[in-house]
Amino acid sequence: MAPERLRSRALSAFKLRGLMLRGEAVKYLTEALQSINEIELEDALEKIIDAVEKQPLSSNMIERSVVEAAVQECSQSVDETIDHIFNIIGAFDIPRFVYNSERKKFLPLLMTNHPAPNLFGTARDKAELFRERYTILHQRTHRHELFTPPVIGSHPDESGSKFQLKTIETLLGSTSKIGDVIVLGMITQLKEGKFFLEDPTGTIQLDLSKAQFHSGLYTESCFVLAEGWFEDQVFHVNAFGFPPTEPSSTTRAYYGNTNFFGGPSNTSVKTSAKLKQLEDENKDAMFVFISDVWLDQVEVLEKLHIMFSGYSPAPPTCFILCGNFSSAPYGKNQVQALKDSLKTLADIICGYPNIHQSSRFVFVPGPEDPGFGSILPRPPFAESITNEFRQRVPFSVFTTNPCRIQYCTQEIIVFREDLVNKMCRNCVRFPSSNLDIPNHFVKTVLSQGHLTPLPLYVCPVYWAYDYALRVYPVPDLLVIADKYDPFTLTNTECLCINPGSFPRSGFSFKVFYPSNKVVEDSKLQGF
């Protein structure tokens, strides 16, 4: 393409996004894009502008150095290496993005005035934790077709089916009765026995005597859409519902190729044609999920022997072993007992050379394993416990709880916590149908966009690292390893599984095939 035409196209593309290029920057960009054909030019410019906007910009006048950095980032993302195929991402390595309401986009932490996260959080971190949860759900709800403002000149019936979110401040400022209002807020119990709704603008007392609850587990500290009327400083609730969920593809349509998930890739792996091709071609790839691997129980070790001998001819890509790794979690000898148990497991694995050389082993600590108490995210086991095992089984990774796994273009979140029980115990009102608890549970987690929509005194979280527990954008596979009965569900284009407790459920586990997104229920009973 002629340099003048290329220059004109580049300037126009930047202008459309409210950016101006300095002369040197235009010259560099024209040279860099000279080899690209006209069909690919528009996509290339879009990617470069996205990379420019990720950088901390002091003004809309773009310097050459900024464009150079953006071009370099884009050229790296095109040249995917083997490192991008399989990655285990610890909770403390997940990138943090903060939603900017003015720019209507997520900004990386460096481009905000937020400090770097610290385990010993400040009061601001605690308040920010709930504000960010609210903001993410608010922007997601606002984009839903029921809450988008009607188009000017649209049919009256269409306008009538739209809803408008109100803030609590709006209600508190009114002296008269307000009917048919919908408010997005968090359920709290500020006084014993009295529930309130809270948002960044204020709190309001709730009257739940006539409230109807849609499907889900409505716990304290979860965010709800409350519909009802306001009178005498009390919000009388007719119905409670959860904020609408959103498929990952819809989220990415708004926020482009930003890598929210983490890992070495600068951009989201979802956009990579190379990785997608590798994923489709490798039909033998499989992930085995096992929870409550009690290594101190002879019967569990025998079943692992049977499992490894069965898989030895065609080793899985990865075994994900979740805690607890001991049936007797407490005691002065707990750490030494775990080291001995891991040594026994290493002996078993080394007895199957195919698995030892081909499969990866990922260890996710459980709530009663040795470590730093019950606060999430939970760090991996201490190196002093795992050193010997890692030397003998080099393809092993001891990671955090929760953790993330990226395989080609697929995103997997793994979380070991007895969450179903906690959420059922802390419900504002328990669902009438006990049989459908897994559906209620999965809907709640995905609607909240968070792994633990519970009060902090029930499920403590490091305030500054709360973002590591987000389930937004929705992953391809969500594994919540719980002692509750095993289940497999699909909701919002997301597969949600619970492998169940290995010893308690008759030695059941789950097998996931990424190439066709199929989950297989497996059991070792009767062997």
From Swiss-Prot:
Keywords for this protein: DNA replication, DNA-binding, Nucleus
InterPro entries noted in UniProt: DNA_pol_a/d/e_bsu (IPR007185), DNA_pol_e_bsu_N (IPR024639), POLE2 (IPR016266)
Signal peptide: none
Cellular localisation: Nucleus
Record-annotated membrane-spanning stretches: none
GO molecular function list: DNA binding
One GO term of the biological process aspect: error-prone translesion synthesis
UniProt feature coiled coil, ranges: none
Family annotation (Pfam families): DNA_pol_E_B, Dpoe2NT
Top-level taxonomic group: Eukaryota
Subunit comment: Component of the DNA polymerase epsilon complex consisting of four subunits: the catalytic subunit POLE and the accessory subunits POLE2, POLE3 and POLE4.
Family to which the UniProt record says this protein belongs: Belongs to the DNA polymerase epsilon subunit B family.
Other comments on record: In eukaryotes there are five DNA polymerases: alpha, beta, gamma, delta, and epsilon which are responsible for different reactions of DNA synthesis.
Name of this protein: DNA polymerase epsilon subunit 2
Lineage: Eukaryota, Metazoa, Chordata, Craniata, Vertebrata
